[in-house]
């Protein structure tokens, strides 16, 4: 049975197609269906994949729990997918939660005491763990024990509980916000990088097969090169292009259909959308190309500072459209040319395309 796609939204307040975070619970369910189950199926992140393959094989050979794993990098690159793959390859169950959900020590203790031998506990947004919960986690990671306080007041006493050996997989987009004691307790640390166009085209082709969509190699590449180096965005664009092709192109996604669909969706050949162009135009037209502080920029375009720093900027910086300097944000020569303008003398040169054409 083919995986059902979500509907094409034309609401003005619809989430950005090129946003790296999941847009809706429905999208998350589609992502789960498209997710590779084993390392052999996992595309890209060659260094992290090869390391995990060795570490998992060694742990299985010794019948031990895999060492604790920290996965960090921009959103949408496959941290959750890798956590599921680790559990699958180890032949164990995975419990999933997130840092903000674990408000009290008891929340974490309940999860830890229910883990079976060598199970995987996946904590997304681990940088958002509260300090009191983090303190409970330290002895669990080091000694597979937790201290529970029973009773209240003068009669309260601490009881030490033994845990089954387990693997913590932590995921974060903000590795710098992790405390040093927590970071030091991870034996395996992997940074996930933006994907190149070839790997994304492979992912798009695989996903199209699961979605029962007819796509040519050229059509897959056209979708991939606008996906901002991010598999989640590639799969989202694929679903929208698939909708267009079914209505306007006889169901076949070739270069022409992909180009027409993405033009309709206002995603340009470089993967920039309206929000990206709005930010770049503000720097160029309102602040003469910069430098401009992020707070001033946020006010100029009506966005939150965190949205600019976490969602919009990473791609623009990696792709050579924006420079972050001590004095503020500056547009590069690539930005001026992209907007059809002549770069002023002394403007910043581009750092180039890091994802591959």
UniProtKB/Swiss-Prot annotation:
Cite the residue spans of the region called Small ATPAse domain (RuvB-S): 196-266
Q: What class of enzyme is it?
A: hydrolase
Cellular component, GO, one term:
cytoplasm
- Positions with a binding annotation for Mg(2+): 80
Compositionally biased region (Polar residues):
1-10
Region annotated Head domain (RuvB-H) sits at 269-357
UniProt cross-references to InterPro entries, sorted A to Z: AAA+_ATPase, AAA_lid_4, DNA_helicase_Holl-junc_RuvB, P-loop_NTPase, RuvB-like_N, RuvB_C, WH-like_DNA-bd_sf, WH_DNA-bd_sf
* This enzyme's EC code(s): 3.6.4.-
**Residues noted as binding DNA in the record, renumbered to the chain:** 305, 324, 329
Pfam families assigned = AAA_lid_4, RuvB_C, RuvB_N
- Matching SMART domains, A to Z? AAA
Q: Which Gene3D superfamilies match?
A: 1.10.8.60, P-loop containing nucleotide triphosphate hydrolases (3.40.50.300), Winged helix-like DNA-binding domain superfamily/Winged helix DNA-binding domain (1.10.10.10)
Presence of keyword DNA-binding: yes
**NCBIfam families registered for this protein in UniProt:** PRK00080.1, ruvB
Q: What is known of its domains?
A: Has 3 domains, the large (RuvB-L) and small ATPase (RuvB-S) domains and the C-terminal head (RuvB-H) domain. The head domain binds DNA, while the ATPase domains jointly bind ATP, ADP or are empty depending on the state of the subunit in the translocation cycle. During a single DNA translocation step the structure of each domain remains the same, but their relative positions change.
Annotated function:
The RuvA-RuvB-RuvC complex processes Holliday junction (HJ) DNA during genetic recombination and DNA repair, while the RuvA-RuvB complex plays an important role in the rescue of blocked DNA replication forks via replication fork reversal (RFR). RuvA specifically binds to HJ cruciform DNA, conferring on it an open structure. The RuvB hexamer acts as an ATP-dependent pump, pulling dsDNA into and through the RuvAB complex. RuvB forms 2 homohexamers on either side of HJ DNA bound by 1 or 2 RuvA tetramers; 4 subunits per hexamer contact DNA at a time.
Of which family is this protein a member? Belongs to the RuvB family.
- PANTHER family (alphabetical): HOLLIDAY JUNCTION BRANCH MIGRATION COMPLEX SUBUNIT RUVB (PTHR42848:SF1), PTHR42848
Q: How does it assemble?
A: Homohexamer. Forms an RuvA(8)-RuvB(12)-Holliday junction (HJ) complex. HJ DNA is sandwiched between 2 RuvA tetramers; dsDNA enters through RuvA and exits via RuvB. An RuvB hexamer assembles on each DNA strand where it exits the tetramer. Each RuvB hexamer is contacted by two RuvA subunits (via domain III) on 2 adjacent RuvB subunits; this complex drives branch migration. In the full resolvosome a probable DNA-RuvA(4)-RuvB(12)-RuvC(2) complex forms which resolves the HJ.
Q: Please give the name of this protein.
A: Holliday junction branch migration complex subunit RuvB
Native organism is: Bordetella avium (strain 197N)
Q: Which taxonomic lineage is given here?
A: Bacteria, Pseudomonadati, Pseudomonadota, Betaproteobacteria, Burkholderiales
Query: Quick one: which gene encodes this?
Result: ruvB
